[in-house]
């Protein structure tokens, strides 16, 4: 049987995600971000709610990406997620993209010329942002031209790099309906961005979200809920360079900007430069919020939920892969667990995220 991997955030889960799961074949394993997103923001609803949405709509097994995989630039995000899915035995990776290209050919190119390509990136001027450097590399070696307005395509290229040299086939699915950042309401498939913006519009949610009741019952948060906490972390920390990935230049800019910024968005605007994109600045602010430090990724994989089919697959992996299904006295990943505790501070109604929680079981799918 085919074992298909899907890398996702489901922030929140919508019809486009259901379409992606419907297109996938065989046993469907989702590696999903926890409570903080790749572009440096808290998830609108918590990881357990999003895992349940996925399991109710076609996923067989949902595992969690650790914080230091979730909140990363595309390449590291893709690499970390593919590593986890590879250990769970996937033979194909399905993903949505705005531009369906021959990603398999791109992966083969990277297998062959990866070292040369990375050297090319290293020699590019530091005045370029990381995404600009990556784009220059793909243009040089694969003749690819694209704008930064196609985040799924950028991630797809990161997945192509990550599967290079592994026995995993790539299956791109053309993105349906609205673009990634679109807030348009007159489409067949709405984007996650639009759903976050129109979260109080009942009719809109019912049109575009398959598990709408779960979403409505869950506590919802936005970055602004954490602004007082973020401000406190910035003001009380004498040396921000002790935080993961914060350099001297960024530390100075952030310390200066917090004196006048009245919101997270304003802070991001003030700190962003040509070289440091908004997404990168948001990631740095997420690291500061949770006091992230460089740490090793966990050996074990945290299981958030499964169907009967997913349970059988986990059984077949026993002894080969280290799995965690209940976080108790023994931590799974201290960094992720700390981030989750801080996530809970966003709303008093958010349930405990780790201690004593067991995987969600869905009998049929």
UniProtKB/Swiss-Prot annotation:
Residues annotated for ATP binding in this entry: 7-20, 96, 152, 175
InterPro entries: Rossmann-like_a/b/a_fold (IPR014729), tRNA(Met)_cyd_acetate_ligase (IPR008513)
SUPFAM superfamilies referenced in this protein's UniProt entry, alphabetically: Nucleotidylyl transferase
Pfam families (UniProt xref): HIGH_NTase1
UniProt-listed GO biological process terms: tRNA modification
Role: Catalyzes the formation of N(4)-acetylcytidine (ac(4)C) at the wobble position of elongator tRNA(Met), using acetate and ATP as substrates. First activates an acetate ion to form acetyladenylate (Ac-AMP) and then transfers the acetyl group to tRNA to form ac(4)C34.
Protein name: tRNA(Met) cytidine acetate ligase
Organism of provenance: Streptococcus pneumoniae (strain Hungary19A-6)
